[in-house]
Amino acid sequence: MIIGFDAKRANANFTGLGNYSRFMVDTMATYGDEHKYRMYIPKQCKNASYDSLLKHKNVSSILPRSSVMKRFRALWRTFFIKRGLLQDGVQLYHGLSNELPVGIHRTGIRSVVTIHDLIFLRYPQYYHRLDRIIYNRKFNYACRKADRIVAVSECTKRDIVCLLYTSPSPRDMRRS
């Protein structure tokens, strides 16, 4: 199986989301060595921890292919990455940091999203209004369209059900 990852945070983030993303890819590549893993990143950042993932023979890093998409990386990651996923034969896509590409459910590619927290809904006073609107749309969309949802804690799982009104069934919701 070919598994694609939204690896933006694995490459560009050196704390929580980045550590989680790198851990997931490393663990999957180590114990699921019969599969191939594609890490999709909007741009290459200098990151030795990310680069060490490429030592696995079954892991590769994918950047936007066209010069236009290299300039409009956010659009590529949100809307246009699907074309590359299909060209690369990806069968499962994991949004490691709360997001999925728009329309992925129409591609035939199964999807998983990891939700880390909904702190922007719990404590909205600490977030700009526009950021809350964007996060709310992205998180809601991902939870509605994903084949599986991974909640990083029981608290996050409860928040997903309570604040995003997403039932744990019929799609499974797992706590990592």
Question: Where are the model-predicted features located?
Answer:
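Single conserved hydrophobic/aromatic residue that forms the stacking wall/gate
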Residues: Y165-S176
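Carbohydrate transferase catalytic cores enriched for Leloir-type hexosyltransferases
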Residues: M1-S167
